[in-house]
């Protein structure tokens, strides 16, 4: 537009954004975004779920390509159920980046679980 890019967003604004399934049920939130600094890709969103007030919460690394922003919901929608997210590989946040996610194993497990083609 003449006034600037209207779809740009800071990653700090994405953190905490609600995530919904395609049925409209809230299934979690974006806790953080993991970047691949060598390939310029967003690896995944760390989708926080479970736990109470952050205690016992786990993080499912969901490939970024699966998240679609919904203006109506003011959050992201993923094409899966809450049960599918709960059954997905889940980790502590620090594990997602330690040794490049244990040398890529976390990234590979995540992309394979969600049947998303590898970009690497």
Task: Give residue ranges: language-model regions.
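Peripheral interaction segments used for macromolecular assembly
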Residues: 1-120
């Amino acid at each position: 537009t003449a006034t600037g890019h209207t779809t740009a967003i800071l990653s700090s604004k994405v953190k905490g954004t609600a995530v919904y399934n395609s049925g409209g049920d809230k299934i979690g939130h974006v806790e953080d975004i993991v970047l691949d600094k060598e390939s310029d890709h967003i690896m995944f969103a760390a989708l926080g779920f479970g736990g109470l007030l952050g205690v016992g919460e786990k993080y499912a690394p969901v490939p970024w390509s699966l998240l679609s922003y919904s203006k109506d919901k003011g959050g992201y929608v993923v094409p899966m159920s809450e049960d599918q997210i709960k059954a997905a590989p889940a980790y502590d946040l620090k594990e997602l980046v330690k040794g490049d996610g244990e040398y890529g194993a976390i990234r590979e497990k995540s992309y394979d679980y969600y049947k998303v083609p590898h970009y690497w």
